[in-house]
Every structure is written in structure tokens, then in C-alpha cells.
Amino acid sequence: MLRTKVFATTVARISGIRRYIPIRTINTVTKKNISKIEKLCEVLEVNPDGYKGKERIPTKELTKLLYTTSRNMLVRVPMTGDLSTGNTFETRNETLQKLGEQLIHLEINKMLTITFTNFNQFNIMNKNFNYIHNLDRARVVNMDSISWLIKNSLKINQLAHLRIPANLPKEMGLTSSSNDFQNLNDWKVILSFIGYLKLLEIKNDNKKFIESIIKTICIPLINYHLRKS
């Protein structure tokens, strides 16, 4: 029954038929789940000698933990365990490195095509970014890491589904002291700025301009939020 509904919804969207189907967002970011996720993260630890490489994260179990399903979900997360996305993620920050690898292994690019009725109901990166906020270690993003997210994590044709506000810079705040910014979750900030910068990239063919915005606005704001307790 569920498969039939999902298939019918998918066909309706492809064919251009619009109809309202409520989407229920279930928050699975609890202390119990965070503890489970941290244990799963241990398999990504780099061996001290640096030669044996990293073990693969148990994608199937992590996916079950992070993504809840209900009768109102339009798309169910595929649990194939396939990790071959062709992307790479490298940063000196160990925690962010783990996060980036998980995003790749969970094939976040495919999941971003899900349509949501409201921007606040975006329920994918929420699960990936929220648990990292609770780890007792320094968290920081740099030019390389955020550039990977911008260039490889989102595609322009997927941004249409996210309903990014037209006045996003004003809403998100351009300084780290902005009250608007402080009230937002880090996953919203990252996702919104990535989307905004990708939209700018269409209108402006100036890479230095984009890099300047990333360096002066995007990275400081994200790091400011990640440092909050």
C-alpha cells in the first residue's frame, strides 16, 4: 500500500499534477539516538598509523536511525548500502570529516530531491548536523570543507524544492551578532547559505566574488553557530 502511494505521488509529480499531501516531520534527535550515532561514528576513526584506511560506516543501520518513516512520507530512503557516489571529502577537522563522509555515504544528493511543503520541514540534513552539535570537541568549518558542500553537495536543479527566501541575506543575518542568526539551527544556516551562493553563481560568473562571500560571510557565521553551547 505504501509503495503504491509513493509511486503514485512520484508519477503525479513527474507528470506535473499538483496535489497537497501533508508531510509529518518526526524529530529523532534525542539523547538516546545521539548516543547511538556517536557509537556508529567510531567506525570512521582513522587508524593511528594512517595506512589501514577507514572502515565503512554501516549505512543501513545509520539510515534507519536517522530517518523515520510514516504513512505520510512521500519518499522512503533507499537502504542499498551503496557508497559509490564518486565524491571525496577532506578536511583537517576530524568531526567535520566524519560528517562529510557520512553525507557522501548516505548519498545526500539523491535525497535532496524530496519536495517539502515548508522550508522548516526539511528533515534530512537536520539529522546529520544536529548530533554533531552535541559532541564535546571543537567544531569548525574552513574554506575547503564549505566549498565541497557548495560545489558537490547541492545541484542547481535541486534548489527549486527548498523554497529559499528571496531576502535570505537579511533574514539570515550578515554579522555573527545578529539575533536572527542566533535563533537558527546550524543546518538551516548552512543549507540556506549554500543555496544562496549557488543562486549567485548562476547570476555572477565571478569565482572570486563567490569565494569572497563564502570567506567573509558564510564561514564566520557557521563557525560562530557551531561554537555555541
From Swiss-Prot:
Changing residue 100 to A: In CBS1-1, which is respiratory deficient. Residues 1-25 form a transit peptide. GO terms for cellular component: mitochondrial inner membrane; mitochondrial ribosome; mitochondrion. It is found in: Mitochondrion inner membrane. Keywords: Activator, Membrane, Mitochondrion, Mitochondrion inner membrane, Transit peptide, Translation regulation. It is a peripheral membrane protein. GO terms for biological process: mitochondrial respiratory chain complex III assembly; positive regulation of mitochondrial translation. Its main location: mitochondrion. GO terms for molecular function: translation regulator activity. Present with 556 molecules/cell in log phase SD medium. CBS1 protein devoid of mitochondrial targeting sequences can enter mitochondria in vivo, possibly due to a bypass of the mitochondrial import system. mRNA-specific translational activator of cytochrome b. The cytochrome b (COB) leader RNA may represent the target sequence for CBS1 and CBS2, tethering the COB mRNA to the inner mitochondrial membrane, where cotranslational insertion of cytochrome b into the membrane can occur. This is Cytochrome b translational activator protein CBS1, mitochondrial. It comes from Saccharomyces cerevisiae (strain ATCC 204508 / S288c) (Baker's yeast). The gene is CBS1.
